[in-house]
């Protein structure tokens, strides 16, 4: 058998042909911009988190008396341990930044619209899994903020009628955050990334069923090129830029995105003066505390994800991309500003005037999803595909 025939035979194997179909010969719109590179970048972030997490787990001890010291052991005694920890800790923030940009790009260009509803729903599930994974990963360092963050967040389940207290006891594995809680969170944090991998593969498969959206928001099977080598090279530019950005945080500001109280061993006796979650939880924290009643605040979190899930089913857009919808553009930038304001409010102390100001951004956030279908019905716009007009 010649070398050429051997290569062809290899590509015909089930696994190789699947990889070739989805990663090499996948037909891609030729006008994709750099904003479409955040999907592959998110995959790289996930791989970084899994690899660094596995190596960190080799040196970590999930016990309340040893957890904090084992983290310090990684930092001081393990060769390259400081790099592993800073890559993992800052990598979580980089992962969330990339995914946020990926989500907002989809909102701007309406990538969630028909026939890609299932792609969007899977994306929301992935986002929810990421939040749970990040929260379970915040507890294992067993610093002061880790302990009290776990105590406060898990206590929110007590707002659920009838079964709330039972759920809290089950989460804790006892009557307070202790060794059982630490072991449960560490185990879940080790498991969830692999579930994320499976959900991401389903997300990719669902996307490739109908193909990628593009900046124009129209579909054409004529103006497409293979993913390799064109978009590999284009994505490579984004990967290099991300590597530089990531390296700056690792080597020059590794602790900026963390909290100094987490360098104090967990102590259930003194309460920190201001319990602040990680930056990626701040918008949810702001929505939670915008309603004075505990049950109302917890109930306000669920609609955030329900709105994101329901958005693809608003059958109202003749024009998909916001490039041709100036009204929707304004609403989108208002949502982005509101998201930043939620993050700022979430890190402020619970006192005037922040409490009053904090009740406005959640209202604007939910208003966005309520009025999104309206601008989509203004104007006929461009056809859904280049061939629509010729087929009529």
Swiss-Prot record:
The main subunits of complex b-c1 are: cytochrome b, cytochrome c1 and the Rieske protein. SUPFAM superfamilies: a domain/subunit of cytochrome bc1 complex (Ubiquinol-cytochrome c reductase), Transmembrane di-heme cytochromes. Heme 1 (or BL or b562) is low-potential and absorbs at about 562 nm, and heme 2 (or BH or b566) is high-potential and absorbs at about 566 nm. CDD domains: cytochrome_b_C, Cytochrome_b_N. Its main location: mitochondrion. A ubiquinone binds at residue 208. It comes from the Eukaryota. Gene3D superfamilies: Cytochrome Bc1 Complex, Chain C. Heme b b566 binds at residues 102, 203. PANTHER family: CYTOCHROME B (PTHR19271:SF16). The chain crosses the membrane at residues 38-58, 82-104, 119-139, 185-205, 231-251, 295-315, 327-347, 354-373. Keywords: Electron transport, Heme, Iron, Membrane, Metal-binding, Mitochondrion, Mitochondrion inner membrane, Respiratory chain, Transmembrane, Transmembrane helix, Transport, Ubiquinone. InterPro entries: Cyt_b/b6_C (IPR005798), Cyt_b/b6_C_sf (IPR036150), Cyt_b/b6_N (IPR005797), Cytb/b6-like_sf (IPR027387), Cytochrome_b (IPR030689), Cytochrome_b_C_euk/bac (IPR048260), Cytochrome_b_N_euk/bac (IPR048259), Di-haem_cyt_TM (IPR016174). It is a multi-pass membrane protein. GO terms for biological process: mitochondrial electron transport, ubiquinol to cytochrome c. Heme b b562 binds at residues 88, 189. This is Cytochrome b. Its cofactor is heme b. GO terms for cellular component: mitochondrial inner membrane; respiratory chain complex III.
């Amino acid at each position: 058998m010649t070398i050429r025939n051997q290569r062809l035979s290899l590509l015909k194997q089930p696994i190789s042909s699947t990889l070739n179909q989805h990663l090499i010969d996948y037909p891609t719109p030729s006008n994709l911009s750099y904003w479409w590179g955040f999907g592959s970048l998110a995959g790289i972030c996930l791989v970084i988190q899994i690899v660094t997490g596995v190596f960190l787990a080799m040196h970590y001890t999930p016990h309340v008396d040893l957890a904090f010291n084992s983290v310090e052991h990684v930092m001081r005694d393990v060769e390259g341990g400081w790099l592993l920890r800073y890559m993992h800790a800052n990598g979580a923030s980089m992962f969330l930044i990339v995914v946020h940009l990926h989500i907002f790009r989809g909102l701007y260009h309406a990538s969630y619209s028909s026939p890609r509803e299932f792609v969007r729903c899977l994306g929301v599930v992935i986002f929810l899994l990421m939040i749970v994974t990040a929260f379970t990963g915040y507890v294992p360092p067993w610093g002061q903020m880790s302990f009290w963050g776990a105590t406060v967040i898990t206590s929110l389940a007590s707002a659920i009628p009838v079964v709330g207290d039972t759920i809290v006891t089950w989460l804790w594995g006892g009557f307070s955050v202790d060794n059982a809680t630490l072991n449960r969170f560490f185990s879940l944090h080790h498991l969830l990334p692999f579930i994320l991998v499976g959900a991401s593969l389903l997300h990719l498969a669902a996307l490739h069923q109908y193909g990628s959206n593009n900046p124009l928001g129209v579909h054409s099977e004529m103006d497409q090129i293979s993913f390799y080598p064109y978009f590999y090279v284009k994505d490579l530019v984004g990967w290099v830029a991300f590597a530089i950005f990531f390296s700056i945080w690792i080597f020059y500001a590794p602790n900026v995105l963390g909290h100094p109280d987490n360098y104090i061993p967990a102590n259930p006796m003194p309460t920190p003066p201001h319990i602040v979650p990680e930056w990626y939880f701040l918008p949810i924290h702001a929505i939670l505390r915008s309603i004075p009643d505990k049950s109302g605040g917890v109930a306000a979190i669920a609609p955030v994800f329900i709105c994101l899930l329901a958005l693809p089913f608003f059958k109202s857009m003749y024009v998909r991309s916001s490039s041709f919808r100036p009204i929707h553009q304004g609403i989108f930038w208002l949502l982005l500003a509101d998201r930043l304001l939620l993050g700022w409010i979430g890190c402020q102390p619970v006192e005037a005037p922040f409490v009053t100001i904090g009740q406005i951004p959640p209202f604007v956030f939910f208003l966005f999803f309520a009025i999104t279908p309206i601008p989509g019905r203004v104007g006929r716009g461009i056809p859904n595909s280049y061939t629509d007009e010729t087929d009529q």
